[in-house]
């Protein structure tokens, strides 16, 4: 059972990283947060941020970023 658990954890991690990398290809490059306002305007209840030279639209719920 221990081997199965670790295999499932590894497979789930690989899937999360693969989908995260795919999503990152659609992001817009930025130099500051103001560049991200128009990109994030397509979403509701988000806060634009320029993180790692790319626009991120952060949604805060209960103090946890999703």
Curated annotation (Swiss-Prot):
Molecular function GO labels: potassium channel regulator activity; toxin activity
Disulfide bond residue pairs: 30-50, 36-55, 40-57
Tissue/organ expression: Expressed by the venom gland.
SUPFAM superfamilies cross-referenced by the UniProt entry: Scorpion toxin-like
Keywords, in A-Z order: Disulfide bond, Ion channel impairing toxin, Neurotoxin, Potassium channel impairing toxin, Secreted, Signal, Toxin, Voltage-gated potassium channel impairing toxin
Subcellular location: Secreted
UniProt keyword Signal present: yes
One GO term describing the cellular component: extracellular region
Alphabetical list of InterPro entries matching this protein: Scorpion_toxin-like_sf
Transmembrane segments: none
Signal peptide (UniProt feature, chain positions): 1-24
Broad class of the protein's primary localization: secreted
Family as reported in the entry's similarity comment: Belongs to the short scorpion toxin superfamily. Potassium channel inhibitor family. Alpha-KTx 30 subfamily.
Function description: inhibits Kv1.3/KCNA3 channel.
Misc. comment: Negative results: does not block Kv7.1/KCNQ1 channels.
Comment on protein domains: Has the structural arrangement of an alpha-helix connected to antiparallel beta-sheets by disulfide bonds (CS-alpha/beta).
Protein name listed in UniProt: Potassium channel toxin alpha-KTx 30.3
Annotated organism of origin: Scorpiops jendeki (Scorpion)
């Amino acid at each position: 059972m221990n081997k199965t658990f670790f295999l499932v954890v590894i497979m789930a991690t690989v899937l999360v990283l693969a989908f995260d990398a795919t999503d990152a290809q659609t992001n817009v490059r930025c130099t500051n947060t103001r560049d991200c306002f128009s990109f994030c305007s397509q979403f509701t209840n988000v806060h634009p941020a320029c993180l790692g030279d790319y626009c991120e639209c952060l949604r805060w719920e209960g103090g946890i970023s999703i």
